[in-house]
UniProtKB/Swiss-Prot annotation:
GO terms for molecular function: peptide-methionine (R)-S-oxide reductase activity; zinc ion binding. This is Peptide methionine sulfoxide reductase MsrB. It catalyses: L-methionyl-[protein] + [thioredoxin]-disulfide + H2O = L-methionyl-(R)-S-oxide-[protein] + [thioredoxin]-dithiol. The keyword Oxidoreductase applies. Belongs to the MsrB Met sulfoxide reductase family. GO terms for biological process: protein repair; response to oxidative stress. It comes from Acinetobacter baylyi (strain ATCC 33305 / BD413 / ADP1). Keywords: Metal-binding, Oxidoreductase, Zinc.
Amino acid sequence: MGKLNKTEREWQRELSPEEYRITRQKGTEPAFTGQYWNTKQSGTYVCRCCGTELFSSISKYDSGCGWPSFYKPINTTAIEEHDDFSHGMVRTEIVCHHCDAHLGHVFEDGPQPTGLRYCVNSASLQLKTDEKNDEETYP
């Protein structure tokens, strides 16, 4: 599947102002405010902009940081990583492979088995719940 190319005007029409600010302008929502920071429902988290599957609720955990956190993406091609030197910091930005939506950042302070923490803005995600099993996936 190739890259999804839309104009900024198209993105602005399709997304809420907050979703646009975060996904297209590399914004960040305040900690502990996003829709999914504390969600424990089972399902698949997809890109808010294009619907690409990004994370499974199985890999979601409570990192205490106030943003949805995952220890791995749903597959190795769903996400791209880029160096981010903004705000006087050195970080690794994560974006959707299909549409380049800004998702958040990945840090090397997560749990095993990966040791990684994919820290993602809720506004970048949409949860597609499992219809068969809508129970909590982590304590």
